[in-house]
């Protein structure tokens, strides 16, 4: 998917693309390196951000989902990632590793960067700090 927000196909995608950029910038400030944005496997799924997390002992490949949601009775951004969505992300990550075997030896982790907006927040208070959840869910039997 193009990195230029004006090329995204819907207002929802353009809005989400803005949060993905904020998330990517935030994670880079934490020392992660962005490898890919909006990586897609046709008919399987898309991963918002794929990053390398350099650590002292080994590097970790991070597949990150970015979610923004208004807090409501239906839960926050983190809770919006259903088991079905997790399975789709895991399946897409497997395709990424098949297409990029040079990363296959790395430890892998699924993170979420969540943005929760309070319902009724004024525009002046609309900016939301990202909540970074490392290892938000696990893949069984890679």
Whereabouts are the PLM-identified features?
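Mg2+/Mn2+-dependent nuclease catalytic core
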Residues: 69-93
């Amino acid at each position: 998917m193009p990195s230029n927000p004006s090329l995204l196909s819907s207002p929802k995608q353009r809005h989400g693309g803005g949060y993905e950029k904020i998330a990517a910038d935030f994670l880079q400030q934490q020392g992660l390196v962005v490898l890919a944005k909006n990586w897609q496997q046709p008919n399987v799924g898309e991963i918002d951000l794929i990053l390398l997390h350099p650590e002292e002992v080994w590097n970790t490949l991070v597949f990150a989902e970015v979610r923004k949601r208004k807090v409501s009775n239906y839960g926050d951004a983190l809770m919006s990632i259903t088991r079905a969505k997790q399975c789709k992300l895991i399946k897409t990550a497997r395709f990424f590793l098949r297409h990029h075997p040079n990363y296959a030896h790395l430890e892998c982790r699924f993170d979420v960067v969540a943005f929760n907006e309070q319902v009724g927040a004024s525009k002046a208070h609309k900016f939301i700090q990202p909540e970074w959840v490392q290892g938000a869910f696990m893949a069984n039997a890679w």
